[in-house]
Amino acid sequence: MHFVLSVAVTLKDEAKVLARLKPGVAAPFTFPKAPTLPKARFDHPPVVVGAGPAGLFAALTLARAGVQPILIERGKPVEERTKSVQMMQEQGILDPESNVQFGEGGAGAFSDGKLTTGTKSPLIRTVLQTFVDHGAPEDILYIAKPHVGTDLLKGVVRSMRQEIIQLGGQVRFDTRLTGLMMRGESMEGIMVLCGGETQEIRTDTVILAIGHSARDTMQTLFRQGVRMEQKPFAMGVRIEHPQALISQSQYGKCWTHPALKAADYKLAVHTPDGRGTYTFCMCPGGEVIAAASQPDGLCVNGMSYHARAGENANSALLVGVRPEDFGDDHPPVSYTHLRAHETRSNL
């Protein structure tokens, strides 16, 4: 067994050292700088819909630019949301507006807190640093597979909300988008449902960060003419195994060494028809949790706490679903297709 490390070092005479080394051994490196945010002005506060990762970062960025945004979220703040999730796990009682999918932090808040992307964006460092500034472990800045953990991520999310408010922004929970107020092609505001009453929020700028599971909101937006297009997605099941089995398989005879953390894995295969099947969101030392957001549905997800000290490991086993599988290029057909598979699976 061996380990692969990439190390960044600071040297007095970098050019001299590089000249002595063989090509490919080392190269100059500079951490990407965080973008400078220009101060912006709007006639009305911009509205961000959804307090998942995209919405939180959008609202935080606007707040840092001096804009004082309004962030609305149909679910509850993470403190109250935790109680709703516990009620579902322990008693099987679902709150359709506050669950593993809906609420502050989005689905990721109760889904392990792995930070992963297939891109090489220079903004990655800024995102990771923001998490650290709000309480995430500093090691996410340099480990290959950064992981916060569900237990720590809740505090990070709460801290990000507090910064938005301190900078003059608003965060409104239990507030669901029900429609856009348009005059021709111009945005004049949005309609929301809050406390059982319909309210209007005047704005000319709306950022939609509604996530994966707000299908009612997606259908409303489509009926109002918001441009949408079908895209590939994946669906599948969760597989679970003893963590000892995975660690022994990956580490061999060294698997019990105290310096080694719970092992993970990633598998992928392309079937003869070209469709991909692969594992995703592997949770070492984690658990499978109930993750439904609809009263008539059954869904599971995987998560780990920061220590990853549980007895079992789990992973999603997914298969790709392509737009040509839907049989129609009408955007809502993709939801109908997905719903049909979900219904058959539940039955």
Positions of predicted regions on the chain:
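Beta1/beta-strand and adjacent pyrophosphate-binding region of the FAD-binding site
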Residues: 42-51
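Glycine-rich FAD pyrophosphate-binding loop
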Residues: 67-85
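A conserved short coil-to-beta-strand element within the FAD-binding core of flavoproteins
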Residues: 173-186
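Conserved N-terminal/central alpha/beta ligand/cofactor-binding core
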Residues: 1-5, 80, 86-170, 175-176, ...
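Mid-to-C-terminal "cap/lid" subdomains and adjacent gly/pro-rich loops that border
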Residues: 230-321
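Flavin (primarily FAD) binding-site architecture
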Residues: 213-223
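Conserved small/polar residues in nucleotide/adenosyl-binding loops
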Residues: 336-343
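Short hydrophobic core segments
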Residues: 49, 201-211
